[in-house]
């Protein structure tokens, strides 16, 4: 179940929210869009990019029209991937983007950490969750030690994901995806 955990910068829990509407409302107050999408038909894990896009075509077109995205892709990662640790470590570093970061979880799960003011808002996302992180928001992403997810990524610029790392070590103070998933 998707949920939101709010921490102080030292890693102490301030609040745990498990109800979808309350999670969505709290994130909206921060400028973060959080929605639930449903596929037009059931997808297997092996579904390719065309099948995935077709299954969520209505929501994808709505978001593209609203924000003017120039490109999108479908990415996936499984525990057996030999580069999983390398990929995880890149995303675990706090960073910002000059553009907002938009993801939709087709399957599996991942956790977005939003460092806003003196709090860290931890959004555990799973199948059916759409999240949009505002531009210049300090954040990081954890896919866990055994990553399993498939996601649609939306981009305004053809280059896609361009990060500006903050150099902060705050991600070491906040529990990992594996810990958050167990709440």
UniProtKB/Swiss-Prot annotation:
**Annotated site (Important to generate the dianion):** 103
Q: Per the UniProt record, which EC number(s) apply here? A: 1.13.11.54, 1.13.11.53
The record's comment on cofactor binding reads: Binds 1 Fe(2+) cation per monomer.
**Annotated binding of Ni(2+), by residue:** 95, 97, 101, 139
The record's annotation in InterPro entries points to: ARD, ARD_bac, RmlC-like_jellyroll, RmlC_Cupin_sf
Give the cofactors, semicolon-separated.
Fe(2+); Ni(2+)
A GO molecular function annotation here is: iron ion binding
Q: What does this protein do?
A: Catalyzes 2 different reactions between oxygen and the acireductone 1,2-dihydroxy-3-keto-5-methylthiopentene (DHK-MTPene) depending upon the metal bound in the active site. Fe-containing acireductone dioxygenase (Fe-ARD) produces formate and 2-keto-4-methylthiobutyrate (KMTB), the alpha-ketoacid precursor of methionine in the methionine recycle pathway. Ni-containing acireductone dioxygenase (Ni-ARD) produces methylthiopropionate, carbon monoxide and formate, and does not lie on the methionine recycle pathway.
Quaternary structure annotation from Swiss-Prot or TrEMBL: Monomer.
Q: Which family does the record claim for this protein?
A: Belongs to the acireductone dioxygenase (ARD) family.
Q: What is this protein called?
A: Acireductone dioxygenase
């Amino acid at each position: 179940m998707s949920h939101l955990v709010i921490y102080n910068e030292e890693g102490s829990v301030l609040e745990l929210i498990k109800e979808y509407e309350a999670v969505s409302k709290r994130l909206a107050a921060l400028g973060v869009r959080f929605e639930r999408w449903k596929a037009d038909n059931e997808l297997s894990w092996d579904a390719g990019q065309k099948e995935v896009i077709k299954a969520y075509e209505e929501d994808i077109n709505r978001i593209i029209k609203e924000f003017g995205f120039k490109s999108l892709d479908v990415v996936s990662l499984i525990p057996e991937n030999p580069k999983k640790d390398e990929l995880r470590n890149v995303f675990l570093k706090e960073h910002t983007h000059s553009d907002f970061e938009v993801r939709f979880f087709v399957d599996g799960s991942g956790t977005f950490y939003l460092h806003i003011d003196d709090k860290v808002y931890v959004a555990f996302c799973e199948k059916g969750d759409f999240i949009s992180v505002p531009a210049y928001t300090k954040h990081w992403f954890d896919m866990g030690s055994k990553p399993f997810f498939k996601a649609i990524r939306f981009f305004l610029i053809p280059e896609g994901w361009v990060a500006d790392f903050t150099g902060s070590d705050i991600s070491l103070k906040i529990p990992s995806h594996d810990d958050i998933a167990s709440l």
